[in-house]
């Protein structure tokens, strides 16, 4: 049996109490913004509270809000977004928590609540540098162990910092500074006024 968005929102507000900062209903979906210090208890309540029962963590990712809305964003830079599914109630919810420190973004791990979060949290750590406190094995998962930086951050250089190549003289893979020159891709301006109207 499916639950309406309004009744789901009321149940979640009751279950989360002061941990809830904001609820957003948009495009038929419900987003909950929770306090960073109450993130893990709120997620546990979403799983175990009888009005919620979100048994499955579908996805968890990091977000870099710098430059969001054409630079109009004034809130914290990094957030963690989780999508939860309640099979028993046929309901979905999105949970967003903002990292309080932009220099060292960190939130609690939810691996103890949903073991499936392990690799999602490792991915967010690898790509955004978000630290998940209490994670049993927080290390890179997609980039090389010697990789410098976090490639999904908006201030990461487009061409990267170093490049890998095989050196036949050393017979091994080596790292070297990026040799690609940065360039601006400016669209070509067509000055012919009849361009594109079918005339030759």
UniProtKB/Swiss-Prot annotation:
Its EC number is 7.1.1.-. It holds the Pfam family Complex1_30kDa. It is found in: Cell inner membrane. Coiled coil: none annotated. The keyword Membrane applies. It comes from the Bacteria. GO terms for cellular component: plasma membrane. The keyword Amino-acid biosynthesis does not apply. GO terms for molecular function: NADH dehydrogenase (ubiquinone) activity; NADH:ubiquinone reductase (non-electrogenic) activity; quinone binding. It is a peripheral membrane protein. Belongs to the complex I 30 kDa subunit family. HAMAP family: NDH1_NuoC (MF_01357). NDH-1 is composed of 14 different subunits. Subunits NuoB, C, D, E, F, and G constitute the peripheral sector of the complex. NDH-1 shuttles electrons from NADH, via FMN and iron-sulfur (Fe-S) centers, to quinones in the respiratory chain. The immediate electron acceptor for the enzyme in this species is believed to be ubiquinone. Couples the redox reaction to proton translocation (for every two electrons transferred, four hydrogen ions are translocated across the cytoplasmic membrane), and thus conserves the redox energy in a proton gradient. This is NADH-quinone oxidoreductase subunit C. It comes from Thiobacillus denitrificans (strain ATCC 25259 / T1). The gene is nuoC.
């Amino acid at each position: 049996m499916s639950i309406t968005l309004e009744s789901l929102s009321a149940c979640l507000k009751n279950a989360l109490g002061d941990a809830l900062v904001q609820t957003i209903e948009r495009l038929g979906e419900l987003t909950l913004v929770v306090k960073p210090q109450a993130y893990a208890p709120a997620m546990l309540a979403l799983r175990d509270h009888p009005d919620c029962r979100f048994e499955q963590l579908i996805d968890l990712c990091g977000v870099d809000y710098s430059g969001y809305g054409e630079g109009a964003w004034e809130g914290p830079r990094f957030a963690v977004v989780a999508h939860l599914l309640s099979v028993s109630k046929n309901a979905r919810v999105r949970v967003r928590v903002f990292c309080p420190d932009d220099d060292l973004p960190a939130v609690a791990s939810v691996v103890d609540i949903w073991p499936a979060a392990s690799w999602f949290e490792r991915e967010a750590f690898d790509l955004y540098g978000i630290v998940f406190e209490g994670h049993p094995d927080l290390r890179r998962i997609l980039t090389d162990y010697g990789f410098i930086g976090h490639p999904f951050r908006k201030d990461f250089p487009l061409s990267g910092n170093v490049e890998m190549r095989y050196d036949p003289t050393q017979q091994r893979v080596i790292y070297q500074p990026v040799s690609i020159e940065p360039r601006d891709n400016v669209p070509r301006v067509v000055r012919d006024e009849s361009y594109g109207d079918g005339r030759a």
